């Protein structure tokens, strides 16, 4: 891949992002023919990964001028920045917004790979990963595994080989590189989770989706380093509506009237689904009285041809809604009802509703539920499945972000748990003991509460608290994660399922 400096100039001018060029000869608004015809062969925002042919982006709150100085010493000649730096570079390209500039230049450098793919984007406070996986399984059937996926849990650019994601939605440079790789791998469809931070920080600036899916909205990610208010969080989430050719909306989502109004105002066609028929609902589902894993899709007009019976492996009515949203999105990009039925029936999600049996016959659930709504839905489902026993819940909360979850977890534990085991979950730079204390401070119900900071020991303790086969133990928050984020380092972690399984095997 290459791009000329003239092409870079044109991209920036088109978006009104260019301020000026700085070279040893001075400050200018234009480029000489010699300089303008020069091409760069790589893009980077890592100052340790540059050559003379790299276009380097000076971005981030933690960026320091010394990083650029060191990069220039290593041979870097061209940089993009919001401010000029006193460095002996051949060219500084000064822009009004570095994140927007990186997005549009990454698109151009990788030859607009989004235009060569069918793009499906999911947003919502909960359910994004599960709904994305349902869509992946459906489209794998429809496209013979020519579907790429970027998700919180795992990602694949060839439809088969998975790798761990660093961010829910990657930086724009990485995103377009991944899209270009997917195109080179023969992929025709591209599914991704779109976070509120992706819109707030312009990672998906100017990116439009063939289909967007808005699952739900509840307060989350509200903290000084994420979203200062719920309004800011919700506004960023709503940007998916205005950047989709068609939007799929959940009728039961909080603030649904505003979501629908946003789509109407932006003239974005909307398809509405829900758990109950209603005048505004295009597709609803009814749960089978004979089989809790079966549901019936109903529709007054059935414009997409989706009405019929579906079976899935994942329990919980909320997963039926996730499956229905995936089916609607999949049909909009070329799948058939039969392919939807086949894909939904086959879907499994790492770290979602995984279960095993404790030594005394009690069921152990491992799930990624990591905010109020997802944990409440999970615990409600488990309560319904195990009405006669105690519900033992192991949970922790992340450090340095989503601080409001600590209060939320105390609240949901008070509402639904019988026993709580508080432990470590990606504490980052914070003291996990203090995080657990904050959660416990918001538990208002009289109940046993244990704090065991070593997560492996906490899992063993939670399982040992079960006394009958009627009990249920929920290990929440980590899902299939195989690391703990501690002080900027991803420390290896065996995983909740593996640790629970090892404890059970040792006791048997």
Swiss-Prot record:
Pathway as given in its UniProt record: Cell wall biogenesis; peptidoglycan biosynthesis
Enzyme Commission identifier(s): 6.3.2.7
Post-translational modification: Carboxylation is probably crucial for Mg(2+) binding and, consequently, for the gamma-phosphate positioning of ATP.
Residues annotated for UDP-N-acetyl-alpha-D-muramoyl-L-alanyl-D-glutamate binding in this entry: 47, 168-169, 195, 203
Main localization of the protein described in the UniProt heading: cytoplasm
Location of the protein in the cell: Cytoplasm
Keyword entries, A-Z: ATP-binding, Cell cycle, Cell division, Cell shape, Cell wall biogenesis/degradation, Cytoplasm, Ligase, Nucleotide-binding, Peptidoglycan synthesis
Motif placement: L-lysine recognition motif: 425-428
Domain of life: Bacteria
N6-carboxylysine modification, residue list: 237
Enzyme class: ligase
One annotated GO molecular function: magnesium ion binding
Binding site for ATP: 124-130
Similarity annotation: Belongs to the MurCDEF family. MurE subfamily.
UniProt cross-references to PANTHER family, sorted A to Z: MUR LIGASE FAMILY MEMBER, UDP-N-ACETYLMURAMOYL-L-ALANYL-D-GLUTAMATE--2,6-DIAMINOPIMELATE LIGASE MURE HOMOLOG, CHLOROPLASTIC
Record function comment: Catalyzes the addition of L-lysine to the nucleotide precursor UDP-N-acetylmuramoyl-L-alanyl-D-glutamate (UMAG) in the biosynthesis of bacterial cell-wall peptidoglycan.
NCBIfam families assigned to the protein according to its UniProt record, in alphabetical order: murE (TIGR01085), PRK14022.1 (NF010628)
Name of this protein: UDP-N-acetylmuramoyl-L-alanyl-D-glutamate--L-lysine ligase
Native source species: Enterococcus faecalis (strain ATCC 700802 / V583)
């Amino acid at each position: 891949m290459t791009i000329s400096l003239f092409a870079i100039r044109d991209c920036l001018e088109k978006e009104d992002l260019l301020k000026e060029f700085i070279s040893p000869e001075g400050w200018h608004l234009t480029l000489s023919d010699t300089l303008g015809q020069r091409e760069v062969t790589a893009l980077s925002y890592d100052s340790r990964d540059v050559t003379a042919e790299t276009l380097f982006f000076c971005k981030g709150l933690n960026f320091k001028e010394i990083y650029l100085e060191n990069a220039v010493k290593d041979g870097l000649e061209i940089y993009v920045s919001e401010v000029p730096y006193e460095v002996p570079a051949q060219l500084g390209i000064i822009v009004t917004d570095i994140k927007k500039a990186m997005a549009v230049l990454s698109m151009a450098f990788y030859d607009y790979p989004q235009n060569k793919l069918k793009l499906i984007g999911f947003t919502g406070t909960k359910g994004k990963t599960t709904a994305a996986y349902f869509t992946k399984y459906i489209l794998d059937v429809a496209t013979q595994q020519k579907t790429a996926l970027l998700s919180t849990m795992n990602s694949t650019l060839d439809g088969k080989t998975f790798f761990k994601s660093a961010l829910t939605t990657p930086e724009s440079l990485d995103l377009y590189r991944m899209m270009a790789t997917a195109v080179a791998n023969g992929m025709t469809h591209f599914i991704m989770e779109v976070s509120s931070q992706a819109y707030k920080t312009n990672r998906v600036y100017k990116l439009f989706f063939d289909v967007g899916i808005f699952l739900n909205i509840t307060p989350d990610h509200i903290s000084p380093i994420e979203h200062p208010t719920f309004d800011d969080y919700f506004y960023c989430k709503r940007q998916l509506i205005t950047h989709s050719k068609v939007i799929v909306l959940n009728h039961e989502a909080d603030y649904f009237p505003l979501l629908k109004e946003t789509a109407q105002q932006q003239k974005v066609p909307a398809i509405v689904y829900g758990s109950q028929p209603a005048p505004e609902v295009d597709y609803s589902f009814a749960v089978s009285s004979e089989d809790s894993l079966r549901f019936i899709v109903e529709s007054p007009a059935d414009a997409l041809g989706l009405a019929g019976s579906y079976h899935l492996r994942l329990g919980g009515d909320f997963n039926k809604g996730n499956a229905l949203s995936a089916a609607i999105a999949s049909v909009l990009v070329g799948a058939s009802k039969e392919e939807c039925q086949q894909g939904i029936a086959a879907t499994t999600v790492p770290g979602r509703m995984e279960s095993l049996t404790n030594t005394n016959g009690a069921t152990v659930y491992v799930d990624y539920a990591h905010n109020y709504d997802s944990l409440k839905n999970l615990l409600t489902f488990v309560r319904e499945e195990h009405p006669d026993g105690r519900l033992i819940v192991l949970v922790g909360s992340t450090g340095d972000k989503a601080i409001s979850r600590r209060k939320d977890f105390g609240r949901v534990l008070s509402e639904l748990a019988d026993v709580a085991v508080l432990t470590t979950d990606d504490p980052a730079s914070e003291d996990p003991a203090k995080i657990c204390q904050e959660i416990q401070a918001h538990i208002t119900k009289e109940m046993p509460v244990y704090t065991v900071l070593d997560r492996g020991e906490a899992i063993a303790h939670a399982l040992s608290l079960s006394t009958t086969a009627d009990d249920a133990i929920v290990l929440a928050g980590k899902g299939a994660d195989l690391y703990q984020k501690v002080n900027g380092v991803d420390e290896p972690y065996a995983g909740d399922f593996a640790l629970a399984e090892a404890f059970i095997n040792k006791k048997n």
